Regions:
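Alpha-helical structural signal in soluble globular domains
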Residues: 65-69, 156, 160-164
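Phosphate-handling substructures
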Residues: 67-124
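GST superfamily/GST-like fold recognition
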Residues: 151-155, 181-183
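Short glycine-rich phosphate-binding loop at a beta-alpha junction
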Residues: 47-55, 139, 144-148
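Domain-level recognition of soluble alpha/beta enzyme cores
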Residues: 162-187
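Active-site-proximal alpha-helix that buttresses catalytic centers in soluble enzyme cores
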Residues: 6-71
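Short, hydrophobic/glycine-enriched beta-strand segments
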Residues: 1-8, 147-148
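Short, active-site-adjacent cap segments at secondary-structure transitions
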Residues: 12, 59-60, 81, 153-155
Length: 187
């Protein structure tokens, strides 16, 4: 299975904030720019106009434009960014240092109150990927899957695709893909 996944456009006014599943606004021009990139990519690669989206606005709004251009959009909550629970939407500076230290030192298993751990994110990503592979049913020539996703989800999928272990400490977490950039993952 081939997965082409674009990171959503950069949200507005989020500098210094912990943003996971907080629904934040994105400039309409940036949403349109990503929709244009995806449409051009699909045309050049001669792919079906089918794309998967997270229910968060920074992904979903791209799908709104693409659906007006003939794309079939499928929304899946499993594609959402990591859930930071009570941290979500707060300034990083306002989150207790001890909690952040605990998270950084037990990166795979620590979950903020009412949030999810990195292990839980990985489980969610792997379940979604396995469902897509199952749907393909072992076809020799499967149709690539297109997604507009989030940095944490993309990093988790990359780590899964390369059969690496889940990072145990924050320093092992890879650098995030740039906004509007796509990654190709092979499973």
């Amino acid at each position: 299975m081939i997965l082409y996944i674009w990171r959503h456009p950069k949200p507005m006014n989020t500098e210094g904030f912990c943003i996971g599943q907080t629904d934040v606004k994105v400039d309409k021009r940036k949403i349109k720019r990503l929709a244009n990139k995806i449409e051009r990519f699909v045309r050049i690669k001669q792919l079906p106009k089918i794309i998967w989206l997270s229910p968060l606005q920074r992904s979903l709004k791209v799908g709104d434009i693409l659906s007006q251009r003939g794309f079939h959009c499928q929304v899946s909550p499993e594609l959402s960014e990591i859930n930071f629970g009570e941290w979500d939407g707060q300034l990083w500076a306002q989150i207790e240092k001890k909690e952040i230290d605990d998270w950084c030192n037990n990166f795979a298993n620590f979950a903020p109150n009412n949030g999810e751990s990195l292990q839980q994110l990985f489980n969610r990503v792997e379940e979604w990927l396995n469902a897509r592979i199952f749907e393909e049913g072992g076809k020799i020539e499967s149709i690539p899957i297109l997604v507009v996703g989030h940095a944490g989800w993309i990093n988790a999928a990359k780590i899964i695709a390369t059969s690496q272990d889940i990072p145990k400490v924050a320093a092992e977490w890879p650098r995030s893909v740039n906004y509007l950039q796509y990654s190709r993952l092979d499973f």
